[in-house]
Amino acid sequence: RIDMMEKHPMGSQAFIPMKETTFLAFVAPKGDKPEIEKIQSFIIPPGIGINYKVGIWHFPLISTEDMNFLVVDRKGSGDNLVIEDLNKYELILDFKPAV
């Protein structure tokens, strides 16, 4: 259930998996609030890391098994986390395999 999204307005955020497993990423474009109709989901194959650009809305990563990630995040002053509650929506995302 995608019940919230977060963004980091002051820095990008990278996730490098510490073992070979598949995980899911859910993202929405930059903006004041996530645009529900523009949320996209991606299946990230084993051995691949991801980097969210500054301001990209995303849901915490979902792994197909227990997983640890090396996280590269911004350090410094200022609030670099914005959370938007999505509980008022019922989100159903279709899976369409890449061609």
Task: Describe these PLM feature segments.
Residues 54-70:
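Ligand-binding loop in jelly-roll beta-barrel domains
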